[in-house]
């Protein structure tokens, strides 16, 4: 099973720049350091956004969770990095109840450790 409407998956600029590539963010700083080591840069934030979208299109959903906010989909699979490596990551997407825009929205992304697999 794939996320619903994967071709309409949304990765917001603020999610990438304000969180996943922000070394000052209290929750995102370790992710930002990791993604930076893999070659992703704030100046080319769309590279990470596109890599995460592609991962969601190609990879299978591993978990589905319903909440009062909507349905969350956990996806595990590889992304291609600017350094040419393949990196196994977990992404979380949400289809919000009563959302005005189509497609799932990225909630978070982080590297999978060997114990996660």
Task: Outline where the language-model segments fall.
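Low-complexity, intrinsically disordered terminal/linker segments enriched in charged
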Residues: 113-117
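Functional cores of ribonucleases/endoribonucleases
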Residues: 51-105, 112
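Compact soluble domain cores
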Residues: 1-77
């Amino acid at each position: 099973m794939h996320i619903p409407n994967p071709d309409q998956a949304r990765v917001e600029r603020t999610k990438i720049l304000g969180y996943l590539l922000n070394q000052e963010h209290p929750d995102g700083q370790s992710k930002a350091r990791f993604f930076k080591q893999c070659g992703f840069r704030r100046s080319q934030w769309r590279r990470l956004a596109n890599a995460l979208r592609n991962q969601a299109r190609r990879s299978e959903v591993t978990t589905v969770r319903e909440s009062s906010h909507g349905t969350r989909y956990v996806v595990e699979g590889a992304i291609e990095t600017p350094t040419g490596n393949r990196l196994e990551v977990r992404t979380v997407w949400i289809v919000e109840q009563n959302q005005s825009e189509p497609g799932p929205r990225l909630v978070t992304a982080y590297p999978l450790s060997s114990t996660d697999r």
